[in-house]
Amino acid sequence: MAHMKHPGARPDTYCNHTNHADDRRRNIIMPMLDMPLYELRQYQGRNPRPADIDAFWDAAVAEMEALGTSCDLMKADFQVPHSTCYDLFYTGAKGARIHAKLVVPDADKSLPAVVNFHGYTGRAPDFVDLLKWTAAGFVIAALDCRGQAGESEDVGGVKGNTHQGHIIRGLAENDPEKLLFRDIFLDAAQLARIVMALPQVDETKVGAFGGSQGGALTLACAALTPKLNRCAPTYPFLCDYQRVWEMDLAKDAYQELRDYFRRYDPLHAHEKEIFTLLGYIDNQHIAHRIQAKTLMFTGLMDNICPPSSQFATYNKITSEKDVVIYPDFGHEYLPFAAEKAMQFMLEMANA
């Protein structure tokens, strides 16, 4: 008689659905927030795609690459044995001074590296929370998003950080160059290039990971950094804005979309133009640029970044990819996901 694992046992591998058999035959009994899983796997998104989006991002990447990979490293006050902690500063899009945390293990050879992106309104994790990666043999850098809770500079004409309202910032200008997330996407990709250029790093073994806004920036980083090796987003934000709106989920992290319409377009006279402009910072429309091997984590009960919005992006990724499905989980802690993500990166490191 075959022995079943205890229901709470840790999965053996990072992937729970490698062969993608017909999901209609999977015996998962659960409430339904969004589409059935087999429909999610075919869903292609609702948000309009700007006609010139590829040219737009080609020009933006060229602008970023002209800034180079130079950075200033300052030893942090927090230090531990066997690794060195740094505050890393560089000049990002539109001249902003961008900050990241960097931890480098003591080693006499080049190392794999990961870049981490935090959730909306937050900041890079404390140095102590990054040490699990250095213990596993990785260099790790963690971005402070401009305008949020960290040390990066926001050059948007305001004193201090604004924390929220970043999706809609620039919409009133009717110019995608003015969208704040255009610059944050570039900051993320530039940090990956800076890490690749560090003498301690093997540039062929660099990955990115993060959850929510961090998942969105992981995808954007991969889309704008062709040399990135691995991409591990967890329930990514900033995908398929129109679908979020149509599901009446423009609340919580997406609340500013509702606020914008109520204040500036209460009759939705410019609805198409607004969603098309948001299309420039919609990950589904740049996902085809991703070359990194990708592992996404999705909770099917996510009512903040709904599964269909995530799959709108996932389904457009053409590189090798997989998704780990959590049927009963939403926008929250996903058991074993962090371990699976590290295992995914260790496979890169050991290749």
PLM feature segments, named:
Residues 125, 131-132, 138-186, 243:
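Cap/lid segment of the alpha/beta-hydrolase catalytic domain
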Residues 326-333:
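Histidine-bearing beta->alpha loop at or near hydrolase active sites
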Residues 167-212:
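Gly/Ser-rich "nucleophile elbow"/oxyanion-hole loop immediately N-terminal to the catalytic nucleophile
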Residues 16-83:
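N-terminal targeting or regulatory segments adjacent to alpha/beta-hydrolase or S9 domains
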Residues 100, 110-119:
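Short beta-strand element of the alpha/beta-hydrolase
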Residues 219-268, 325:
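Hydrolase active-site cap/lid region
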Residues 290, 296-298:
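Short beta-strand/loop motif that positions the catalytic acidic residue
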Residues 336-351:
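Catalytic active-site module of serine/aspartate enzymes centered on a nucleophile-bearing elbow/loop
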